[in-house]
Structure formats: C-alpha cells, structure tokens
Amino acid sequence: MDKYIVNGRIGEGAHGIVLRGIDKSSMKVVAMKRIALKNINEQGLPNSAVRELLALRLIRHDYVANLVDYFSQGYSLVLVCEYLPIDLNEFLRANVKPLAISHVKSYMWMLASAVEYIHSLHIMHRDLKPANLLIGFRGELKVTDFGLCRVFRNPELVGSTNAEKDQQLFTHQVASRWYRAPELLYGSRTYGPEVDLWAIGCIFGEMLKNSPLFPGENDIGQLCTVIQVLGTPDEEIWPGVSSLPDFHKISFTSTKKQVSFNEILTEVDESSRIMLERFLRYCPKSRITAQEVLEAAYFQQEPLMTPLNDLPLPIEKPLNTATAEFANWDWSATHF
C-alpha cells in the first residue's frame, strides 16, 4: 500500500531512523520511525519493537506523540506518529538565556500530565530526556520514543508472601547517562517508575539552568556529579542502597553536599529550587510522583504557567531531503 511520500530524514537513534513523510490521503505531515528487524524468520519481532508498538497502541494522550499507523516494509517495522517539528534539546540550545519560569512551569505540567497517564497504565518510559520531548506548532510539549519502555506490576496487586519471587527484573542499562537515576547507576534490576521522575527532575533543572544539570562523562563520572550536589548516599538517607549490585564496586569518600542547588541555579526562585529537590532524591520512594507533581502548589504560585497559546513557537529545523537517499526505498506497505 503506497500510502506515504517520504521527503526527509528527521534523525537517527539506537532504535531506528526517523523520517518525515506525507500521508497522501490527508496530506498531513507525519513522522515515520523505521525499525530494522534482523533475523525475523528465526526470532520474530524484537522485544523492544513489540513493546514500543503495544505501548503506542495503548497510549492516547494530548501530551504524547500518538501513533497514527504502523506497517511492515521488507525487514522493517514502520511506526507512523504525529509530526512535531523540533525537540526540547534543540529548543533549549537555540536559546541563549534560560526559559522564563512561567514557560518552564507550562512544559513541566504537560510532561507530568503525560507521565502520570503513562504510569497509570503501568508503563515506565525509561528514556525521558529533552531529545525525546517534542514541541509542536501550537507550543505544546509531547513525549515520544517508547523504544525502552517496560510494563511494571501494580505494587498493590503483588503478593507479599514471596516478595523476592514477585520482583520484576529489568536491565539497568537504560536511560541516557545524564538523566539516569542513581539506582540504575548502582546496577539495580528491581527499580520502578521512580526512574522516570528522576529523569524529569534532570530535565526540569536543565530548563531552569539552560544546560545539563549532571553532565557526567561516564557512569562513574555521572555518580560523581550527583554526589557533588546530593552528597554520598548511605543507608540513613537511602535504605537498601548498600545492597545494590554495584554499590561496593564503586567507592567514594563519604562527603556532604559540596555544591547546593542555590549555587547551581543562582537566578532561579526559591519555589522552583524546592520543587526540583523533590524529584532529585536518592531514595526512589522519597521522590515526588507524577500525580503529586500535578497537585503541587508550585503551579498555583506566581509566576503562573504561560497559557498554551502564548508559549514560544518552534522554528522547524532544516531536514536532509537528498532524494538519492530515498530513491531506492520501497514504501509499499503490508499492514499487520
């Protein structure tokens, strides 16, 4: 089914190439994620592709880049989603100064709304970062790229008699380093949706500061940057930390906070710094939840959120539209 015209490359990541296309029937612009399927006859669809497809089919939210269509093409799975012209990372880099607090509040509200809904479906995103947050032509922010998502069990439905047996095991090699929660850096395989809240806190701080909050060069360096601000974790502030797989493999001299958020965010109001601290806590269970974010008094305090219609509009980035790149692509599609 020759339904789409491909007219440019948006980007490329670990999970596939993202192209800009046009739906011939509606003439709407769409984003098309092409995921290569290796050895499909022997192994079937990769788990990551299945999870992303199932999640996108389930999720319908104003602040998620929703799935429009999907189909197989040769040895590829193509996910067709609504098109948004720029991501938050590009948007922030294009601004010399940090965003206005009222703008930051609006983006945080939209992000928390999306994540609260995603978590209500018992799905962890596990790769929240500015590059996976898109900004649309109306100024709205939407979550994208569910390539690392996983379903987590409802804690209320998990029995307590065989707690160890009931635990889900996940890989800790998820999330981009600068947004990776401490439990992941220490090798935890039994984490939960709190990893997304840590990532949101890092994104929040980056919007306030206009540069990454914890820019570590490697995993150990990442822990160092966090420890400089939060101090060395111990059992008192993070019960169970000493039992994490890599805790004793990485030794740090016990230290208190060396740099405070007041020093990092010198021109940020106190209420924003207090709100940020609620995300960036070592103990996962002490972190604010997405639902609590939406209920926080922070959003009712001055300055109030900028209305959607008054948010800055993105400038669409130039695309790679070299025709030779797409000349030999057969986009006749077989729908599942």
Per-range role (PLM):
Residues 17-38:
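Glycine-rich ATP phosphate-binding loop
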Residues 232-277:
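C-terminal lobe substrate-recognition/regulatory segment of protein kinase catalytic domains
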Residues 107-108:
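Activation segment signature within eukaryotic-like protein kinase domains
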Residues 70:
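Activation-segment/catalytic-loop signature of the eukaryotic protein kinase fold
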Residues 75-87:
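Conserved short submotifs of the Hanks-type protein kinase catalytic core
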Residues 34-60:
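Conserved N-lobe beta3->alphaC-helix segment of eukaryotic protein kinase catalytic domains
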Residues 304-336:
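C-terminal intrinsically disordered, low-complexity extensions immediately downstream
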